[in-house]
Amino acid sequence: LEPELVTGMGTAADMENVAIESLTYKELTVTAIVTGGIETNGGRVGDPADYYKPAEKPDKLGTINIILILDMPPGTLARALVTCTEAKTAAIQELLAGSNYSTGLATGSGTDQTIIVANSDSELYFEGAGKHSKMGELIGKTVTKAVKAALSKQSGLNPKTQHNVFRR
């Protein structure tokens, strides 16, 4: 492997609990590969911070990791990342997963990571990846479904277990 062409993600999640979802519309395919667990690190954006530590890297490894594969050139990657993050947050909030640091619902963990893989040679081009576009719809559906599946596999977090108010 050429070091300048590869990347990695760290996680405490069991790789056997990975969730993979893929959707296709006409010539467009979106695939989400997700590992996840937020039972010990789930938090809400804006919660009180655990630390202020200028350093090379934090102590904890990533917990909700998403690899999003898009069959398109990298022109709309920034918006695709926003849509992916919104979908992850929607999945967590639909599961009513609480923050471990405040009384709010979690929006993720403190160490989430996302990698978007785009085909730079693709002849497909889309003007956007937001909620009003088909690309955004596919990103939203694949990521939401994969995040829910990964959290259920890794942590047992699913609508059935969250139905009991005493568990939440």
Residue ranges and their predicted role:
Residues 1-168:
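A structural signal for small-residue-enriched, beta-sheet-centric alpha/beta enzyme cores
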